[in-house]
């Protein structure tokens, strides 16, 4: 991977910021899962969300299989950050940028494991609700 080229490409995207980190330095715990399970209306309704996405430990194992992690941040204004529905509505713009970053990594020969902070919205009705496998596993970003 050519880091200079990648960083130049990242600087051309509408990112608030980005940084690289060793996956061993990431913190994996169940606090975020608690929010999913107790506050998010999408929990259990998409393959990107618990329990479909797997356990925190399975996510940790997959992340630790990488030698480097790229964290990106975008900013979208909302009136009330505590309004989960309003916050979830900002998903499409961020996911589109995540997809662009994923493509840049693929062009460098890296198959990324893209995690998101929100549920998947690719399909109108997720296959998990019908007991079927994900129809778009190559496009779905699992929720952290």
Describe these PLM feature segments.
Residues 1-22:
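TRNA-binding/sensing appendages of the translation machinery
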Residues 16-46, 50-144:
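Catalytic cores of enzyme domains
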């Amino acid at each position: 991977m050519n880091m200079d080229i990648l960083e130049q490409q990242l600087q051309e995207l509408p990112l608030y910021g980005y940084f690289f980190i060793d996956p061993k330095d990431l913190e994996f715990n169940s606090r975020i899962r608690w929010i999913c399970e107790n506050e998010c209306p999408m929990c259990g309704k998409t393959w990107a969300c618990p329990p479909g996405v797997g356990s925190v430990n399975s996510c940790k194992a997959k992340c630790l299989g990488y030698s480097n992690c790229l964290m990106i941040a975008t900013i979208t204004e909302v009136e009330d950050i505590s309004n989960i529905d309003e916050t979830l509505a900002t998903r499409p713009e961020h996911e589109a940028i995540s997809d662009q970053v994923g493509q840049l990594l693929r062009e460098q020969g890296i198959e990324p494991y893209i995690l998101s902070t929100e549920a998947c919205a690719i399909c109108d009705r997720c296959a998990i609700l019908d007991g079927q496998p994900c129809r778009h596993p190559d496009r779905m970003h699992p929720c952290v």
